[in-house]
Regions:
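Alpha-helical transmembrane segments and their membrane-interface boundaries
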Residues: 1-143, 147-320, 328-376
Length: 376
């Protein structure tokens, strides 16, 4: 009886496929329990998102509470700095990105095909500006994700100015919760403190010259080109199938596209699996009308789980965050099974777009010359 093919006889392509599959599913099942539970971070996100929706339910307008909770979600996850000054800087950047994204979404929304063009241009400009500095890179990625999510809400909102105000109020409320709980947590040594990064000593002129020089290289354009190409494809697919709810493709593209290309295929696949699992979980949560108290409890619970899962499991964190996003953008309406199936398909389409764009862009990246390779 002949033995099966040995490892040495496997083709390189098959070997890479096996290795990649192990990396994706192995990484999805990994669980890092080294970090201690941080009740302060969980309290910030639970109160930041739970209180606005509670107020909305109490006054009989859950959609108002959901809009404010959306702004809180964009800010509440800010890591706690070692000092109030450092914490304020982190929270301030998140608040600015959230409000700017809400304003951009309100301006771009409800203009037909021009809205798609506006999103692509705004996201591309933000991605390009993100190369100016590391803080700008972080802020630009937040802006892109927030604006894409916000556009989906603003597209179905009759009063977009009120939506911006509610999102801003939720963001400011979450910022106050974070700063207040942060002061108490530092005073009583509760939870963990994010490691502070050393601020750059380069002047604005030096950063600008460096950024302008980088714009002459493909590395500076790779992320903006990949992102805008995928968003344009997402808009085209949604327009080609108007009977489906494929606006989620753009949201998934914004969530899945990364500036850094290290292990991108494995990370995108893991996050796509997490989003798909989150969509399936949403069916169990919201396929039937939820009473007000249940909506508040579920949103507060999912919000509290997010910071706890963030450093433990990439897959589990994404799976918990996805129902949160879907509930907050639902306007308090029941999420039907057809919508969930469409969003599951949209997630897979987005993952395919992001990975394809990366593989195409990688062909244009300059290969390191043999002289520059380290020996050994």
């Amino acid at each position: 009886m002949e033995a099966g093919p040995s490892r040495t006889s496997m083709s390189p392509a098959f070997s890479r496929a096996v290795h990649g599959t192990r990396a994706v599913f192995g990484g999805a099942l990994e669980w890092d329990g080294a970090d201690a539970l941080d009740p302060s971070a969980m309290a910030v996100t639970a109160l930041g998102m739970g209180v606005p929706i509670l107020i909305g339910v109490l006054i009989g307008r859950p959609n108002i509470g959901l809009a404010a909770s959306l702004g809180a979600m964009w800010v509440g996850a800010a890591p706690r700095g070692a000092s109030l000054k450092e914490h304020w800087r982190i929270v301030r950047d998140n608040v600015v990105a959230a409000i700017a994204a809400a304003v951009a979404a309100a301006i771009i929304a409800q203009h037909g095909p021009r809205s798609d063009v506006g999103l692509v241009l705004a996201a591309g400009a933000a991605a390009l500006l993100g190369g100016f500095s590391r803080p700008m890179a972080v802020a630009s990625q937040r802006f892109i994700i927030f604006a894409t999510i916000g556009l989906g809400v603003a597209a179905h909102t009759p009063n977009r100015i009120a939506l911006v105000v509610l999102i801003a109020e939720g963001a400011l409320w979450a910022a106050l919760c974070g700063l207040a709980i942060g002061v108490a947590a530092r005073r009583f040594d509760i939870g963990s403190i994010v490691a502070s990064e050393r601020e750059s000593t380069a002047s604005f002129e030096q950063k600008f010259r460096h950024w302008r020089t980088m714009l002459r290289t493909w590395a500076a354009w790779s992320y903006p080109v990949r992102l805008t190409a995928c968003l344009a494809c997402a808009a085209a697919i949604r327009g080609a199938f108007p009977q489906h709810h494929y606006s989620w493709i753009a949201v998934a593209v914004a969530l899945l596209t990364q500036r850094q290309s290290d292990n991108l295929i494995a990370k995108v696949s893991q996050r796509a699996l997490g989003v798909a699992a989150g969509v399936v979980a949403t069916e169990a949560i919201a396929i039937h009308p939820l009473p007000g108290w249940a909506l508040v409890a579920i949103i507060a619970m999912l919000a509290a789980l997010s910071p706890w899962l963030r450093n433990r499991s990439y897959f589990a964190c994404t799976a918990a965050t996805t129902p949160l996003i879907m509930l907050l953008t639902s306007g308090g309406e029941t999420i039907g099974q057809g919508l969930l199936i469409d969003r599951l398909v949209a997630t897979l389409i987005a993952a395919g777009l992001v990975i394809t764009a990366f593989l195409v862009a990688r062909r244009f990246m300059p290969r390191p010359s043999p002289d520059n390779r380290r020996p050994g």
